[in-house]
């Protein structure tokens, strides 16, 4: 029930692999061999605020001191590797950096808000680790990954391809007393970065030169070999073609399931898809044919503006730009109708 998009393993996801291996190894090292050094990685807001120990904002927010949190966050990072493959390592790293920086600010705001509004004194030590960016990744996961029903239980309740990911997130959310503050700050920072609030995505991003340096220095260390199991899929003539076709097939299945769900919701509401937008009525077409040719050309309305974001989403599913533009114009910028139109033609 894990999200399955593209190749299995960590192929073409070096940043996800580094975030999965390095913090987990350091957490084990601090827990088993160096417990006396854990004090340097405690996320102490009181020490940051009153003693100006700014370094704790870095050390206290990288390594998990609780192995249970390290395990759950590692599983979530492994499943969220699909965003590194979709966006690229630089954009994925920029999202993590932006949400990591913003969440530090929201931690202080939430602690002060709880203290002054509810009169509840929050403990100075918040859960340590790279947790806020992990919760921030739930924002694009919820918005951009369609639901595919796997099984149905208890009538309206159903198990989807995203159920286990949400269960892992809930397990991490309930693992400590004050981890909900870190989770809320991560979700808020993820929404701010994903929605481009105050253009934070332009300010908090990885510079090109730095991305090139890390790509040259660290990518060979954390890069994974090409999976050989996919070569058995008899689709294309090469492994790259097979992988691309498999990714396109999975993405199309996801979007087709999403379209079926939207169609069922519209049928339950008593409404059907307005196919008149795709095929005009016969009377209207006759009136158009009776009009004068040059005059109708002068009165022709300009082409419909198409959202570039929706074009990009259709191109990510494997459709060409021309087909995506034509389908979106025919469906009046309805992404679900355009997707169904492209899947059936």
From Swiss-Prot:
GO terms for biological process: negative regulation of canonical Wnt signaling pathway; negative regulation of retrograde protein transport, ER to cytosol; protein localization to endoplasmic reticulum; Wnt signaling pathway. It comes from Mus musculus (Mouse). One of its GO terms (cellular component) is endoplasmic reticulum. The gene is Ubac2. Its main location: endoplasmic reticulum. Residues 305-345 form the UBA domain. Gene3D superfamilies: DNA helicase RuvA subunit, C-terminal domain (1.10.8.10), Rhomboid-like (1.20.1540.10). Residues 40-91, 147-163 are extracellular. This is Ubiquitin-associated domain-containing protein 2. SUPFAM superfamilies: Rhomboid-like (SSF144091), UBA-like (SSF46934). Glycans are attached at residue 161. It is a multi-pass membrane protein. Interacts with LMBR1L, FAF2, AMFR and VCP. Residues 113-125, 185-345 are cytoplasmic. The chain crosses the membrane at residues 92-112, 126-146, 164-184. Keywords: Endoplasmic reticulum, Glycoprotein, Membrane, Signal, Transmembrane, Transmembrane helix, Wnt signaling pathway. Restricts trafficking of FAF2 from the endoplasmic reticulum to lipid droplets. In association with LMBR1L and E3 ubiquitin-protein ligase AMFR, negatively regulates the canonical Wnt signaling pathway in the lymphocytes by promoting the ubiquitin-mediated degradation of CTNNB1 and Wnt receptors FZD6 and LRP6. Residues 1-39 form the signal peptide. SMART domains: UBA. Residues 287-306 are annotated as: Disordered. It is found in: Endoplasmic reticulum membrane. InterPro entries: Rhomboid-like_sf, UBA, UBA-like_sf, UBA_UBAC2.
């Amino acid at each position: 029930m894990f999200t399955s998009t593209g190749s299995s393993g960590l192929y073409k996801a070096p940043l996800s692999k580094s975030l999965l291996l390095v913090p987990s190894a350091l957490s084990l090292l601090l827990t088993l061999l160096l417990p006396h050094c854990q004090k340097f990685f405690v996320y102490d807001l009181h020490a940051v605020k009153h003693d100006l120990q700014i370094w704790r904002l870095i050390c206290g927010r990288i390594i998990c001191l609780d192995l249970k949190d390290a395990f759950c966050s590692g599983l979530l990072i492994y499943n969220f590797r699909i965003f590194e493959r979709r966006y690229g390592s630089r954009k994925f790293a920029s999202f993590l950096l932006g949400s990591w920086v913003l969440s530090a600010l929201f931690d202080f705001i939430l602690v002060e808000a709880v203290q002054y509004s509810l009169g509840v004194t929050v403990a100075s030590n918040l859960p340590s680790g790279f947790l806020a960016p992990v919760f921030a990744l739930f924002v694009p996961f919820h918005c951009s990954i369609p639901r595919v029903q796997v099984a149905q239980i208890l009538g309206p309740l159903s198990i989807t391809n995203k159920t286990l990911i949400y269960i892992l997130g809930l397990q991490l959310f309930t693992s400590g007393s004050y981890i909900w503050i870190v989770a809320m700050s991560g979700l808020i920072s993820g929404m701010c970065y994903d929605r481009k609030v105050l253009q934070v995505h332009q300010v908090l991003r990885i510079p090109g030169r730095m991305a090139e340096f890390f790509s040259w220095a660290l990518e060979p260390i954390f890069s994974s070999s090409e999976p050989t199991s996919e070569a058995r899929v008899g689709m294309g003539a090469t492994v790259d073609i097979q992988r691309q076709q498999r990714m396109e097939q999975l993405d199309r299945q996801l979007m087709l399931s999403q379209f079926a769900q939207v169609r069922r919701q519209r049928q339950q509401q008593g409404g059907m898809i307005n196919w008149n937008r795709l095929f005009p009525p016969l009377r209207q077409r006759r009136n158009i044919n009776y009009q004068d040719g040059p005059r109708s050309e002068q009165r022709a309305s300009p082409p419909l503006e198409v959202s570039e974001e929706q074009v990009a989403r259709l191109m990510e599913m494997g459709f060409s730009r021309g087909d995506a533009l034509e389908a979106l114009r025919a469906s009046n910028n309805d992404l679900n109708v355009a997707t169904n139109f492209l899947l059936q033609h």
